[in-house]
Amino acid sequence: MFDSLKNFLKKSIEDLDGKELEISKEFQEYHNKDSKYIIKNWLFESPQYRKWRVTKLDGGDKLQVFNTVAYPNFKSESPILGADILWFGTSQKLLAIFDYQPLIQEKKYLYQYCSSLDFIKKKYSVFDNNKMKNIYDSKKYFSPWVMICRGNKLNLDRDLNSIFYLFVSDYLRINKLNQNNQFLNYEQIKNKQIDYDKYSAEKDPADKLFKSFFGENWTCNFINNFLFTLNNYSKD
């Protein structure tokens, strides 16, 4: 499941003169003890994005997960793209969260880089679930227009791909339009991305899920050496 999303990202990154990077075998593909859960990861970079990672978790009919995070290079104050998609096969429920995760909460910055999400939410009302906004910290790395969907099989089959393609394409378009920083300099951007990784490594809700499937040692290594690699960096 979700191969079309991964392939779309790969093509989009290649169009930016990007490339796939080699990662360690234990992160490329890892199985839990009875192989009921399999995790696969990919890592890309381009001149515009220092790190663009993709994760797929295959739990068969019970659970399917897709996650991607894009980090612009330190010369760009653009937000970090984040997407989490979970399909619970037993209950036939879809949970998805898409956001352009801002480096700062300044009003002008948010409007310039994140407000186009509002257009997507209005076009696809299923991704405008205000009742679930308590699941994130709005004062940290989330925009006021974070897109949240709690849907069903119809939303999975009919809506998800179209929304995801628009979400990614619009992110790339906005970042291409904003070549000159107005709010942050290089060192500030780097420090904000370090803060983001430290915050995410501590707060990531997938931590418990991964530990239950793959054990604590592998999960800690995965979080620090693949997901949030700036977690152990010191700020300048």
UniProtKB/Swiss-Prot annotation:
Keywords: Oxidoreductase. GO terms for biological process: phytochromobilin biosynthetic process. Gene3D superfamilies: 3.40.1500.20. It catalyses: 15,16-dihydrobiliverdin + oxidized 2[4Fe-4S]-[ferredoxin] = biliverdin IXalpha + reduced 2[4Fe-4S]-[ferredoxin] + 2 H(+). Its EC number is 1.3.7.2. It is an enzyme of class 1 (oxidoreductase). InterPro entries: DiHydbiliverdin_OxRdtase, Ferredoxin-dep_bilin_Rdtase. GO terms for molecular function: 15,16-dihydrobiliverdin:ferredoxin oxidoreductase activity; cobalt ion binding. Catalyzes the two-electron reduction of biliverdin IX-alpha at the C15 methine bridge. Belongs to the HY2 family. This is 15,16-dihydrobiliverdin:ferredoxin oxidoreductase. It comes from Prochlorococcus marinus (strain MIT 9515). The lineage of its organism: Bacteria, Bacillati, Cyanobacteriota, Cyanophyceae, Synechococcales.
